[in-house]
């Protein structure tokens, strides 16, 4: 276990969706001739309308781009290069059955992948999901409502008449573990969640806010606590549909009463480190555990933050 002070700790591991995998090769986005030159030998990631991909043996299954078309179609997005320099593109399309019956392929989305996916696969799938979700909802300009077309190998959209260019946007959100500097931390259950399902407090950053100010405001709004010593831990992209989760921890007072004024949180409680460790050992939200406390799955930064705090001595 990590021997750290009671008021500070760091993440013990990098969240799955934050790890460096494929080379994003961003310089090729503005050189379509070079990007297209790699198409005949490129790999293709199909993402269906439910944001699912085919996975087998811990890796995403990639097809041959040339089987889709003889050149990149306008709706394809360039994800980068994998080992050996092979280009990878993604499209929104139905998943194709695997011809080999010995390959145990299954259709899963990012939420269901957890620890079964390697770093490169997780980066490819998360980038593809984020980009394709954006294209699905950005066919008209936010500036004037005019139709737009994909550009930069799928990394922007352009008004073909005016030349106005728009890029994928993200919505920054904070997620925070509130603890007492000793042996207890706050976990909360949203009103929409089943009984026993708890996680960290989170919320979107408002205009004019820093991340730290957002942490203090969100926790005050959601459970009525005043926090201090807000400290950064790490970040993770979360393409559901386009969030960037920025993780923190902060000190709170267990003697301060909870209040749930905005209706988003149904209940919150202080849990001891031993209670949290037991819940982590029992599994996660998807398990059949009878534990009184069910925690987020391994793909989320929430899980990594909770695990890191629980490992403190």
From Swiss-Prot:
Transcription regulation recorded as keyword: no
Start and end residues of each Nudix hydrolase domain: 168-293
GO CC terms of this entry: cytosol
Cofactor(s) this protein cannot do without: Mg(2+); Mn(2+)
Keyword Electron transport included in the entry's annotation: no
Chain sites annotated for binding a divalent metal cation 1: 202, 222, 264
Xref: PROSITE patterns: NUDIX, NUDIX_BOX
Domain of life: Bacteria
Pfam families: NUDIX (PF00293), NUDIX-like (PF09296), Zn_ribbon_NUD (PF09297)
EC number: 3.6.1.-, 3.6.1.22
Binding site for substrate: 111, 236-243
GO molecular function: magnesium ion binding; manganese ion binding; NAD+ diphosphatase activity; NADH pyrophosphatase activity; RNA NAD-cap (NMN-forming) hydrolase activity
Keyword entries, A-Z: Hydrolase, Magnesium, Manganese, Metal-binding, NAD
Reactions it catalyzes: a 5'-end NAD(+)-phospho-ribonucleoside in mRNA + H2O = a 5'-end phospho-adenosine-phospho-ribonucleoside in mRNA + beta-nicotinamide D-ribonucleotide + 2 H(+); NAD(+) + H2O = beta-nicotinamide D-ribonucleotide + AMP + 2 H(+); NADH + H2O = reduced beta-nicotinamide D-ribonucleotide + AMP + 2 H(+)
Binding residues annotated for a divalent metal cation 3, in chain numbering: 218, 222, 264
Motif (Nudix box): 203-224
Functional description taken from the UniProt entry: mRNA decapping enzyme that specifically removes the nicotinamide adenine dinucleotide (NAD) cap from a subset of mRNAs by hydrolyzing the diphosphate linkage to produce nicotinamide mononucleotide (NMN) and 5' monophosphate mRNA. The NAD-cap is present at the 5'-end of some mRNAs and stabilizes RNA against 5'-processing. Has preference for mRNAs with a 5'-end purine. Catalyzes the hydrolysis of a broad range of dinucleotide pyrophosphates.
Subunit structure: Homodimer.
UniProt family annotation: Belongs to the Nudix hydrolase family. NudC subfamily.
Protein name listed in UniProt: NAD-capped RNA hydrolase NudC
């Amino acid at each position: 276990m990590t021997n750290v002070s009671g008021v500070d700790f760091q993440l013990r591991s990098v969240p799955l969706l934050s790890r460096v995998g494929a080379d994003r090769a961003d310089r090729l986005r503005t050189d379509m001739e070079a990007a297209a030159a790699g198409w005949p030998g490129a790999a293709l990631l199909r993402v269906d309308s439910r944001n699912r991909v085919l996975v087998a043996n811990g890796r995403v299954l990639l097809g041959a781009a040339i089987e889709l078309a003889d050149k990149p179609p306008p709706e394809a997005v360039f994800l980068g290069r994998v080992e050996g320099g092979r280009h990878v593109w993604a499209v929104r399309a139905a998943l194709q059955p695997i011809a080999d019956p010995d390959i145990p392929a299954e259709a899963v989305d990012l939420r269901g992948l957890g620890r079964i996916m390697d770093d490169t696969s997780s980066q490819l799938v998360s980038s593809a999901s984020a980009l394709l979700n954006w294209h699905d909802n950005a066919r008209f300009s936010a500036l004037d409502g005019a139709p737009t077309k994909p550009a930069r190998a799928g990394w922007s959209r352009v008004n073909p008449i005016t030349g106005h260019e728009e890029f994928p946007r993200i919505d920054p959100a904070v997620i925070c573990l509130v603890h007492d500097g000793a042996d207890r931390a706050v976990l909360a259950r949203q009103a929409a969640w089943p009984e026993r399902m708890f996680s960290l407090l989170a919320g979107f950053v408002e205009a004019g806010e820093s991340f730290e100010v957002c942490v203090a405001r969100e926790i005050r709004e959601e459970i009525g606590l005043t926090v201090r010593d807000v400290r950064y831990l790490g970040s993770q992209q979360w393409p559901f549909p386009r969030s960037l989760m920025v993780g923190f921890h902060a000190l709170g007072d267990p003697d301060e009463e909870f209040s749930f004024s905005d209706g988003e949180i149904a209940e919150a409680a202080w849990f001891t480190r031993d209670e949290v460790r037991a819940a982590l050992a029992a599994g996660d939200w998807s398990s059949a555990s009878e534990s009184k406390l069910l925690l987020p799955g391994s793909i989320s930064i929430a899980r990594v933050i909770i695990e890191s705090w629980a490992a403190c001595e």
